[in-house]
Amino acid sequence: MTTATTPKGERRRQALVAAAAELLLEGGFDAVRHRSVASRADLPLASTTYYFESLEDLIARAVEFSGAIELDAMRRRVGEVSHRRRGTDATVDLVLDLLVGPDDSDLDARGQLIARYERSVASARHPELREVQLRLRTQLEELLADVLRRSDRVVRPEQLRRLVAVVDGAVVAALIEGHPEPRRPARAGLLEMIDIVAPPVVPNMMPQQLERARQLD
């Protein structure tokens, strides 16, 4: 593998990463091969081994690329959220906009959702993917904490992870069962717990008390 030290080399490297990310979305990990990536990027076959140490390295970069695009979209969504007190339903819908998407009945959105969970499951077997997924998950949790703060709610780190786990479990089960709208069972699960794991801020709570509530184990 040769580092892409020139502008042309960097463009080629990014083209290969983007091509691999497209193939991941369309066909999963089995679709990502040296030849298919080079063909999609319209580059010589040897370029995949020239710019990347291995196919696993290329896949890891593609996963990071896809995750970064999703996180950028989530940041834009969070940036649109005003800071005000929200009820249970409104808060749950905001959380699901980030974790599931606003419209899971759309075929493209459903494909992206499936690809996201495929990447998560694959990281259990591949250390290079695990590191990428953990970095992406940390950023996702920060965005979730932000949107909950903007909804005038308080959440501790371990409770935030519990919230994500409930959504993950509901969505994966719905996808396995062929549910046309995975967001619906995830919403039902969150409605039962959101006020417990991320309760509304108590009126007149002092800043020190609020920070302690967020950090308390």
What is each model feature region?
Residues A15, L23-R61:
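Helix-turn-helix
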Residues R12-A15, A19, Q159:
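N-terminal positioning helix adjacent to the helix-turn-helix/winged-helix DNA-binding module
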Residues T5-T6:
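Short Lys/Arg-rich basic patches
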Residues V132-Q139, L143:
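Short, solvent-exposed amphipathic helices
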Residues E64-E70:
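Short, basic, alpha-helical segments at the C-terminal edge of helix-turn-helix-like DNA-binding modules
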